[in-house]
């Protein structure tokens, strides 16, 4: 069993046994009913990517390519346009969060990255002094939240540090997430930011190091308990999945494409489970 599968099952069991139910919940299912959830607070996990530990479960298939394309939309295109996401990347799951008829998700994610020139500033800081303790991406912008409607960012802060070990520089990353749908989005979000970490490491010719993942509110929606039990019953696949970025060291961050990533030794348990999403 991979480390990710162990953590996945432990988190599911913890939520089901020790979690509490939400109150005054904002999300709704497509039929208009309130989407309550059972949750725990302060969930933390750690993966050493340099040792082949990746935060992706084998207990069900994870759509890794779409997840990586979303990261490119946010940090390369620096866009909030659904047209860009749909037409350039053929990714459509954000359409349910369109703000009115704007064709956007509001001033969120990529729009905030562009507004503050976040990724260019980060790369410049890492180039100038990678050992400084201020290499942070933050998508939490109160002014933007007041200016437009839209879903507030779930994965909103990423911090980066470097370590020199045996002459090699390793890039570590810490992702902080305010809210996470454990069964649907947990491994998607984690692998998205592992991909971002790998892109930045490649830009500088560094090794990928450790990935730390903190979630403030980790939950299972009240229409997912049957799927949760099914995941607990499943035996994990006998594989060791890992994400590979097939570009040379020193490849410019903005030149990396979704097709450059390869998920190897990944044979997840099937069939896929179905989930009705909360919007």
Swiss-Prot record:
Protein localization: Cytoplasm
GO molecular function ontology, one term from the record: thymidylate synthase activity
Primary location class: cytoplasm
One protein family per Pfam: Thymidylat_synt
Residues the record lists as binding (6R)-5,10-methylene-5,6,7,8-tetrahydrofolate: 181, 278
UniProt entry keywords in alphabetical sequence: Cytoplasm, Methyltransferase, Nucleotide biosynthesis, Transferase
Positions annotated as active site in the UniProt record: 154
Pathway of action: Pyrimidine metabolism; dTTP biosynthesis
E.C. code: 2.1.1.45
One of the record's GO cellular component terms: cytosol
Residues that coordinate or bind dUMP: 133-134, 178-181, 189, 219-221
TM spans (from-to): none
Catalyzed reaction equations: dUMP + (6R)-5,10-methylene-5,6,7,8-tetrahydrofolate = 7,8-dihydrofolate + dTMP
NCBIfam families (alphabetical): PRK01827.1-1 (NF002495)
Subunit structure: Homodimer.
Functional summary from the UniProt entry: Catalyzes the reductive methylation of 2'-deoxyuridine-5'-monophosphate (dUMP) to 2'-deoxythymidine-5'-monophosphate (dTMP) while utilizing 5,10-methylenetetrahydrofolate (mTHF) as the methyl donor and reductant in the reaction, yielding dihydrofolate (DHF) as a by-product. This enzymatic reaction provides an intracellular de novo source of dTMP, an essential precursor for DNA biosynthesis.
Family: Belongs to the thymidylate synthase family. Bacterial-type ThyA subfamily.
PANTHER family: THYMIDYLATE SYNTHASE 1 (PTHR11548:SF1)
Name recorded for this polypeptide: Thymidylate synthase
Organism from which the protein derives: Streptococcus pneumoniae (strain ATCC 700669 / Spain 23F-1)
